[in-house]
Design a protein with these regions (language model features):
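A short beta-strand motif that forms part of the nucleic acid-binding face
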Residues: 117, 126
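Short Cys/His-rich "knuckle" micro-motifs
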Residues: 111-116
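Interaction interfaces in information-processing and related assembly proteins
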Residues: 1-95
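Short metal-coordination and nucleic-acid-contact micro-motifs, chiefly zinc-binding Cys/His arrays
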Residues: 94-97, 118-121
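Short alpha-helical
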Residues: 36, 108, 120
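Alpha-helical hinge/cap motifs
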Residues: 95-99, 105, 109
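Short cysteine-rich clusters marking metal-coordination/redox-active sites
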Residues: 101-104, 122-125
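Short functional micro-motifs and their immediate structural scaffolds
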Residues: 108-109, 127-130
Length: 131
């Protein structure tokens, strides 16, 4: 089964082999994910600051306000990490290293990259790292 985008199938030369270095479909996918993640991080940061300001206006921070701030903070940290992962994947693509396992240097199958475009490891090495 091949995954497709508007630019065509997300496959390597053999359908599930290594990714063509600098493949435009991979760049388009990663850039789309980067924009979505940047928008998410921006929205979460704004929501956090608004919630923080509202908590300050209330005179005293009640438990629900503190819990909301903590939830927003955790989501923001997670989203920033995902944004950084996408930026790193774009850097690997530009450097010609995208689609190659950082641990064993094996080609990462296109099917795995289609499922998790930011992955740095083949399935075997990811299992060994507990990912």
């Amino acid at each position: 089964m091949q995954t497709e985008t508007s630019q065509g199938p997300l496959t390597g030369p053999e359908g599930d082999g290594p990714v063509p270095t600098g493949g435009p479909q991979w760049r388009a996918l990663l850039e789309m994910r980067w924009r979505a993640r940047l928008q998410e991080v921006t929205g979460l940061a704004l929501a956090y600051h608004e919630a923080e300001a509202a908590a300050g206006r209330g005179g005293g921070e009640d438990r629900l306000q503190v819990q909301r701030l903590l939830r927003l903070q955790r989501r923001t940290v997670t989203s920033r990490r995902a944004l950084a992962d996408t930026e790193e994947a774009l850097a690997r693509l530009s450097a010609g290293r995208y689609g190659w396992c950082e641990s064993c240097a094996a080609a990462i199958p296109a099917r795995r990259l289609a499922a998790t475009p930011e992955t740095r490891y083949c399935a075997r090495c990811a299992r060994g790292r507990g990912r």
